[in-house]
């Protein structure tokens, strides 16, 4: 079943297929200048009794668990992955951007080093939709759960070869993040326009990112694994799901996979 073209919306109602009450699916962006929740989202949060994000973000052990998975396996370091010249370049870049010598952070997976620089892509104080959603859930005295464990999420970054991860980092260093900033701006514009189709096209076409090359690991396989969990939660109670917007569109996106299972998934406009 081909995915139909999606309307411009980040919030979707899941109903039918034996569900007693509607659940909601909201596409987040993990980093933005303004994470205010609009009225439709607030109403959906009022009408649900559980918040489920990609990870259980109010789990007190989350940071500790995360830290366990940020290092490369088998004592590998960036020095093993690049030539001498590129190593020098990365050293200067990391010192400049995160204020640490490469000898101290060289054993961290390149993906996580790239992520440390994400806040620099925005010229503002970074806000997150996940945090805003958690605030509301706590006000409503509701639980926050996750669709995957930290271990499962970390395995994603183990499945993408370190060589590919370091390619992204090196590209950022070579143009001093100019490409990253431009790409992120484009992504934010599409997100603010609620254009899931546009985001999907952008993901498919960006040949520079290892995440595009490994879309199956980053998105498709995870979406597939989430469906059963989304069904389980929704059958028990009206649930509000908040996951990265890139997970929603496309043939292997969460919206299409739920529709294939017989649910009605419609845009809240």
Specify the residue positions occupied by each region the protein language model found.
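Structured, acidic catalytic/metal-binding patches in enzyme active sites
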Residues: 14-24, 29-210, 214
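A generic structural signal for short, solvent-exposed coil/turn residues
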Residues: 4-6, 17-18, 45, 233
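Bacterial Sec-dependent N-terminal signal peptides
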Residues: 1-7, 12
